[in-house]
Amino acid sequence: FEVFKGEVISLLGPSGCGKTSIIKAILGLVNFEGVIERNGEGIGYMPQKDILFDWMDALDNASLPLILKGKKKERARDVARKMFREFGLEGFEDKKPYQLSGGMRQRLSFIRAILSGRDILLLDEPFGAVDAYTRRHLQLWLSKNLEKLGSTIIMVTHNIEEAIFLSDRIFILSDKPAKVVKEIVVPLKRPRCLDTFGNPTFSKLEKEVMEVIFS
């Protein structure tokens, strides 16, 4: 399949079908047959299990991508600090990752992925470890800021609502070995908001996705 610049696509399919393997193949972390071509200078990656550095405090973990790109440490920390306020992590800047809850670590990983500022963002179950309230907040934030981010996003998720709300297209995969069973275009206007979930088109898309998955 092909993904276009600035597009958000989701990969939906049964557990173990190979969704994460597709992400790893794009990153060059696994061997595969075939060809993957990509434009763009860099890739940001948020895996299912966070890869935070336990010897660094939360703020340093979040600001690391900016520092690696040449931004002065204090300026990088200031940028990250603003994100902490947006994501409910204010007051935890000095905590080490092992002192944070699973949901907090997930939010911290998301902040770090966003601050990588890459042309391509690969998100593997990015909101899977957070509670329902936080998950909705993160979905709304990402939807609101997609244009500003300017990244092409490939997301793995098991959440049908999430896939419809965030994506331009959804690829439904078969059981292993994964094949694309169906591509579904999401025609909902952007930016999307809470009202989008009540849109009749949203309900039709949800029904269509479920019919494909459970057929």
Language-model regions, residue ranges each:
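Helix-to-loop junction immediately C-terminal to a conserved catalytic motif
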Residues: 27
